[in-house]
Swiss-Prot record:
Annotated protein name in UniProt: Protoheme IX farnesyltransferase 1
Classification via NCBIfam families: cyoE_ctaB, PRK04375.1-2
GO terms for biological process, alphabetical: heme O biosynthetic process
Keyword Glycosyltransferase in annotation: no
Subcellular location: Cell inner membrane
Annotated gene: cyoE1
EC class (word): transferase
Matches recorded under HAMAP family: CyoE_CtaB
Length: 299
């Protein structure tokens, strides 16, 4: 009886499937998508586009996250940060997880086709495939520049939100994509330094594993400088006003401070503190864009 119980697959619950979608990551993506929608127009955003457009983008992002869990299940089982994930622990089997991912993606694309436009659906599909297939299936295990090349897929949500409202691609949403693209390397490399031993154990060629922590910290510092410069471009092209400029400078200089601390190696736990700050940074920067947009409209 004891042997039977020990070999039994753990029970699967709805929370396991919810965890597979990486809801915290999806929420941050949807914030940038929402901002993209509101920045695309001087009028209000139609409630159907706002609700179903973001739901469609979120479902597709969740589907891509599920594929990531399936492909990475053996790696996840080796890492302290991820070993309790549903697939790593066997609470969800790979085939049901893939079926769930397909269902989410189909539902998401159907909503985008029904309530936004064809271009949004195509761009969302490209983003989904870029993350689930190109990054997860190939780049993550192939090169220490994995998150630089694959980061474009994760940077797409503000473009998707903008196109859902406007129906076309323009320079402004591409600039928002560029901000997230520049933000991605310092964000993930800071975590990779903190979790270097785990990535090494799982044989993932993250930059700290292949080139060392000091080299990685230098590149975090350089990318943070690039991010600071790029984050000022919305003001430079008159997309935003003085409020955004002040917020971008304050947030960016604080990010630069943490990148410098990490590079100097003078404080313990600087890597994880830099990683955590980067999350708040992106959230605050996009909220500043949104608030500034409506202030400009009322002037």
């Amino acid at each position: 009886m004891a042997t039977l119980l020990s070999t039994e697959r753990p029970r699967t619950g709805w929370r396991d499937y919810m965890e597979l979608t990486k809801p915290k990551v999806v929420v941050l993506m949807l914030i940038t998508s929402l901002v993209g929608m509101f920045l695309a127009t001087r009028a209000g955003v139609a409630w159907s586009v706002l609700l179903f457009g973001n739901l469609g983008i979120g479902l597709c992002a969740g589907g891509a996250a599920v594929v990531n869990h399936v492909v990475d299940r053996r790696i996840d089982a080796l890492m302290a940060r991820t070993h309790k994930r549903p697939l790593a622990q066997g609470r969800v089997a790979p085939l049901p997880a893939l079926a769930f991912a397909l269902l989410l993606a189909v539902m998401g694309l159907a909503l985008l086709l029904a309530f936004t436009n064809t271009l949004t659906a195509w761009l969302t599909l490209a983003s989904l495939l870029g993350y689930a297939v190109l990054y997860t299936g190939f780049l993550k295990r192939a090169t220490p520049q994995n998150i630089v090349i694959g980061g474009l897929a994760g940077a797409a949500p503000p473009l998707l939100g903008w196109v859902a409202v406007s129906g076309h691609v323009s320079a402004e949403p591409l600039l928002l994509v560029l901000i997230i693209f520049a933000w991605t390397p310092p964000h993930f490399w800071a975590l990779a330094i903190h979790r270097k031993a785990e990535y090494e154990k799982a044989d993932i060629p993250m930059l700290p594993v292949t080139h060392g922590e000091h080299y990685t910290a230098l590149h975090i510092l350089l990318y943070t400088l690039i991010l600071l410069a790029v984050s000022l471009l919305p003001y430079a092209i008159h997309m935003s006003g003085p409020l955004y400029l002040a917020c971008a400078l304050a947030l960016g200089l604080r990010f630069l401070h943490w990148a410098w601390v990490l590079y100097r190696g003078t404080r313990p736990h600087a890597a994880i503190k830099t990683f955590k700050y980067s999350i708040g940074y992106l959230f605050a920067l996009f909220i500043a864009l949104l608030v500034d947009h409506y202030l400009l409209l009322n002037l």
